[in-house]
Amino acid sequence: MLSNILPLSIGAIFGTTARWLLNLAVPASLSPATGNLFANWTGALLIGIFAETVSHPQWKLLLITGFFGSLTTLSGFSLETVTLLQSNRPASALANIFLHTAGSLLLTWLGLKIGTAVK
């Protein structure tokens, strides 16, 4: 059990830190949602690639479940969308939903294709 928890936890620490750093790197002139969008899109692409190229169970736990699971964030996306709705910005909320959902699905698919090609 500990042999699974350790790689999972290490991946989660670095994934969460990467998401936080991405949010800090977003210029103040852009929407606060931009950092999470970039994290979700990057994570979606890379999770597809690594799902196809990593076979060792411990590395899958560290990278896919730990790192990319904590890099990408449904809770941040949900908060941003609800905040936009509460700010009476329904068009921005719908755009946020579309960009996160469609972009993440497309990039995961692309990542799987890339992973298959390099395998």
UniProtKB/Swiss-Prot annotation:
<comment type="function">
    <text>Fluoride-specific ion channel. Important for reducing fluoride concentration in the cell, thus reducing its toxicity.</text>
</comment>
<keyword id="KW-0812">Transmembrane</keyword>
<dbReference type="InterPro" id="IPR003691">
    <property type="entry name" value="FluC"/>
</dbReference>
<dbReference type="GO" id="GO:0140114">
    <property type="term" value="P:cellular detoxification of fluoride"/>
</dbReference>
<keyword id="KW-1133">Transmembrane helix</keyword>
<feature type="binding site">
    <location>
        <position position="69"/>
    </location>
    <ligand>
        <name>Na(+)</name>
    </ligand>
</feature>
<keyword id="KW-0997">Cell inner membrane</keyword>
<keyword id="KW-1003">Cell membrane</keyword>
<comment type="similarity">
    <text>Belongs to the fluoride channel Fluc/FEX (TC 1.A.43) family.</text>
</comment>
<dbReference type="GO" id="GO:0046872">
    <property type="term" value="F:metal ion binding"/>
</dbReference>
<feature type="transmembrane region" description="Helical">
    <location>
        <begin position="5"/>
        <end position="25"/>
    </location>
</feature>
<dbReference type="Pfam" id="PF02537">
    <property type="entry name" value="CRCB"/>
</dbReference>
<keyword id="KW-0406">Ion transport</keyword>
<keyword id="KW-0407">Ion channel</keyword>
<feature type="transmembrane region" description="Helical">
    <location>
        <begin position="59"/>
        <end position="79"/>
    </location>
</feature>
<keyword id="KW-0813">Transport</keyword>
<feature type="transmembrane region" description="Helical">
    <location>
        <begin position="30"/>
        <end position="50"/>
    </location>
</feature>
<feature type="transmembrane region" description="Helical">
    <location>
        <begin position="92"/>
        <end position="112"/>
    </location>
</feature>
<keyword id="KW-0479">Metal-binding</keyword>
<keyword id="KW-0472">Membrane</keyword>
<keyword id="KW-0915">Sodium</keyword>
<dbReference type="GO" id="GO:0005886">
    <property type="term" value="C:plasma membrane"/>
</dbReference>
<protein>
    <recommendedName>
        <fullName>Fluoride-specific ion channel FluC</fullName>
    </recommendedName>
</protein>
<feature type="binding site">
    <location>
        <position position="72"/>
    </location>
    <ligand>
        <name>Na(+)</name>
    </ligand>
</feature>
<dbReference type="GO" id="GO:0062054">
    <property type="term" value="F:fluoride channel activity"/>
</dbReference>
